Amino acid sequence: MIGREQQGKNVIVRATLLLFIIMGFFSMMAYLHTYNTPAQLLHLPIVINTWTFINATRVAYRTMQSGGVTERIALDGIEKGCNWCEAHPDHCDFTVGYGGSPNEWGQTTLDAMVMWGPTREVGAVGYMKRVKPAISVARKVMERTYHTILVGDEATTFAVEMGFEEEDLNTTRTAEMWREWKAAGRKPNFWKGPHNSTQGVTKRKEMNEKPEFGRWNHDTIGMVAIDQQGNVACGVSSNGATWKIPGRVGDAPIVGSGAYCENEVGGAAETGDGDVMMRFSPSNRVVQMMKGGMHPKEACERMVAEILRYYPNCSGAIIAVNKQGQIGAAYMNLPNGFPFCLQNSNMKDAAIITIKD
C-alpha cells in the first residue's frame, strides 16, 4: 500500500504535468493566433509585383476581390494578373509573353512558375515554345501532374494536351530585332571567350560582350498575393534574356529563385540577371529571413548585399510582403532606381512605388 506521503507526491507530479500541458496548449494557441489569424492581417487582399506593370496589379486585385475563379483565390489573382502581361506584352516592356527577348536563333520562348502557399505546391514551365499563357500552363503542371517543371517542346506538347492553342510567339518586331543583331556581328551575347558557331556562320571570336541588364531586355513580372482569408500565392512569367543561348532556362521558373511563398510567413519575388540570381535562391532566402522575424525591407536588403559580395556588377531587385501586410524591396545596379506596384484594401487604386538611393 502506498503511503500518504507518496500519494501526495504523485498528486503534485500529476498536477505539475497537467499545468505544463495546459501552459503548452495556451502557448501554442497564442503562437498560432499571432501567426495565422486573418483578423490580425492588414488591408487584405494585397498584391505586389515587380516593375510598372500596374494593369496586371489591378487585374490580380480585382480577381481576388470578386471571389476568384476557384477556391484558390490568391492563385487566381496571380494567374490572371500575369496573364494580362502575357496577352499585352507591349504594356509590359515586351519582357513578358510573346514578341520579345528572342534567343540566338530568333525564337521567343517562355518561362513561368506558380506556387500555392497553403500546400507548397509548385508548377513551372521553362523554354516553352508556341503557347502564350505560360503561367496558366505552369498552373496545370501543378494541378494536373505530380511534377514540378516541364521544359522545351515537351512542355508545349503538355500544354496542347491540356487544351491550350499553339501560336507563333515570334512577331515582325522580333524578326527585325534578330536581323539587326546579326548585322551587328551577333553582339552582345552570352558566350565566354572565342566560340565556333554550329549555325554555318563565320567563326566568332571575342564574342563575350554580355548584354547589360535593363528593364527593356531582361525582365520578369514577379507577383505575390495574399487573399482575404490570409492565403498566400506567388508567380512569375518571363520571356527570358534577349540573345540567350538556345536551351537556356532562366530564374523565373525556378522555385525559390523567381518567387517563393509560405502561408505562415508571406512571399517574395525577384527580377534581374537571372543566371546570377538563381545561384542564391533569393526569394526563398528572403522568406526564411522574414520567418525569423525580420522586416521584409531588411530581408530584401540583406539578400541584395549578399549577392553583391560575390557579383558586384549584378543588376536586379527583390520585393517581399509578410502576413502582417508589411512591404519591402531592394535593388542593385539600377541607375534609375526600381519601381514596383502595390494594391491593397486601403487603397482606391493600384500605385507605382519607386525606390531610389
Regions found by a protein language model. Give the residues of each.
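Short, low-complexity, Lys/Arg-enriched N-terminal segments of secretory-pathway carbohydrate enzymes
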Residues: M1-N10
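Alpha/propeptide regions of enzymes that mature by internal proteolysis
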Residues: I12-D357
